[in-house]
Each structure stands twice: as C-alpha cells, then as structure tokens.
C-alpha cells in the first residue's frame, strides 16, 4: 500500500495538536522541524508541511504539552477498512473492572493489579484471574449500576467513530474486560464487532471466575486477524488503538497503531501517540 512505503523525512508533515496551541509554539516547531508552511486543520490542530527534521520536536512538545506526529501527506481514512479499539481507558474513560471492584470495596487492590498489567509487569490472563477472584459474590445487578452511572466515553469518541464510519471503515471493540459492557457499548455506538471475556454468574452473583478462554494480548490479535481476513483486508488497512501492554499484539497486527493516553511501553512501539487531546485527535492524522 502506497501509504506505508519508506519515506524520506522531507516528505513528511508534522501534525501538532493540544488543548491550547500557541502561535509561538507553531513558529518554533516549524523552525525546529524545517517545515515550510503552517495550516490549521481544526481549532487546536495544525499541519506543518514538509518537515525535514525530527530530533528536537519530541522534547519541545513534551515541555509544551502538545501532541505531535510525523505523517505521510495525503493519506486518507478511506484507504483503511477497519478500526479496532481497546475498551477500558481507550474507548471508555474508565476501567470497568475497577468500578465493579469499588462496589465490592476492593478497588484499591484491583486497580493496583490493573496498573501493573498495563505496564506489562503481570501476564494479562493471570492478572484477570486475580482481579476477577476479588469480585466473587458481587451481585450481577452491580454491573448494570456501573454501566448506568460510571461508564463514560473518552472525549471525542463519538466524533471519531462517526467520521470513520462515514469513510467506510468497519468498527470493532476488542477488550480484555467483560462482554456485559462491550455488548452495550456496541449497541450504543452502533459498532460492527465486539469481543470480550464472559463473567461466570450463579444465582445472580459473580463466582469470581471467567468462562472460556481468556481474551488477553494474544487473543486480541487473533480476533483482529480473524475479522481482517473475513473482511478481505490487508494488515496495512487496519487501524488499532490501545493504551496498555495487553494491546501491543493487537497493535502490531495493524498497519497504523495509535497509543491513546498510554503507558510508556505502548507509546514506544506505536506508530503515533495521543497524550493530550481526545480520540477525535486521531482524525487529524489523516487528510
């Protein structure tokens, strides 16, 4: 696919976006990057054309709290066929299992395991078993309470999905969390696919176990590849978005991977990283 040939640096555009982008930042970044033109994409997103130098841009943007991305000119969303998204702390602004744990009074313990898992310190399947075991005895109705009262979409999620659907992309959420939430998110956002783990329930209460094979890092990639093949798409036509170490395999199976407010290990391996703006900031990476 032409969008992913190896390019000379002078062929790249530099995308700058943030909560508040100052003119002086744009002028300085254009100088640092050797860009010859600055154009506004949206209110706080800008394209610096023909950027030929990268070395000083990351440190400047980190200090100024700006997102940056070196992108190939003229790559359009319609060149892609599928966007695959993690759910917790990506499509959603919460960790759903942590919120269930809060009702059980074990949020601190579960959240600690969650964070260690996202940093890659614990194998996902084992961490999910540990966290789910702490939920034993929770009333099944607590899941609906969490969905109704605590689930929040990440900023820009609906705008991003609307634009991607308009461009012809299929949409999929793949989660190491629970299908109670992914099924409802799929319906709410009119997604094409949703895959997640299933909690075991007996007599209206969680048993502390997960049914079937756990969807973790490898499982996410397997699901993505299966759907990609069913759709007749190439790897280069896939966009994957995630935040934790268990998303890395899924992201590696995509042509473009985006680390969204992600752990350092994920940012280091992703095609692009978004740290300051919402999910709709992803749209500004394409023309």
Regions found by a protein language model. Name each.
Residues 34-49, 70, 74-78, 90-199, ...:
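Alpha-helical substrate-recognition element adjacent to the catalytic core
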Residues 26, 57, 97, 182, ...:
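Generic structural marker for isolated residues within well-ordered, non-membrane alpha-helices
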């Amino acid at each position: 696919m032409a969008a992913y040939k190896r390019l000379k640096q002078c062929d790249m555009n530099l995308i700058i976006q943030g909560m508040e982008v100052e003119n002086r930042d744009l002028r300085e970044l254009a100088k640092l990057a050797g860009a010859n033109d600055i154009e506004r994409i949206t209110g706080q997103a800008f394209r610096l054309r023909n950027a030929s130098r990268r070395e000083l841009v990351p440190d400047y943007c980190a200090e100024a709290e700006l997102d940056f991305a070196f992108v190939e000119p003229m790559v359009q969303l319609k060149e892609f066929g599928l966007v695959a998204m993690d759910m917790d702390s990506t499509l959603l602004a919460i960790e759903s299992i942590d919120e269930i744990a809060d009702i059980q009074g074990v949020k601190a313990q579960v959240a600690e395991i969650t964070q260690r898992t996202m940093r890659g310190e614990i194998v996902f399947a084992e961490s999910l078993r540990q966290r789910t075991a702490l939920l034993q005895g929770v009333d099944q109705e607590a899941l609906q309470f969490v969905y109704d009262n605590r689930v929040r979409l990440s900023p820009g999620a609906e705008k991003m999905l609307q634009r991607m659907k308009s461009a012809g992309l299929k949409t999929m959420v793949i989660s190491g969390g629970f299908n109670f939430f992914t099924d409802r998110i799929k319906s709410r956002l009119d997604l094409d696919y949703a895959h997640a783990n299933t909690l075991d329930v007996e007599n209206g209460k969680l048993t502390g176990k997960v049914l079937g094979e756990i969807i973790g890092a490898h499982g996410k990639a397997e699901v993505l590849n299966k759907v990609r093949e069913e759709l007749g798409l190439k790897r280069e036509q896939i966009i994957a978005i995630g935040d934790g170490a268990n998303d890395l395999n899924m992201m590696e199976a995509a042509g473009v991977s985006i680390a969204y407010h992600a752990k350092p290990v994920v940012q280091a391996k992703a095609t692009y990283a978004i740290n300051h703006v919402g999910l709709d900031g992803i749209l500004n990476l394409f023309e």
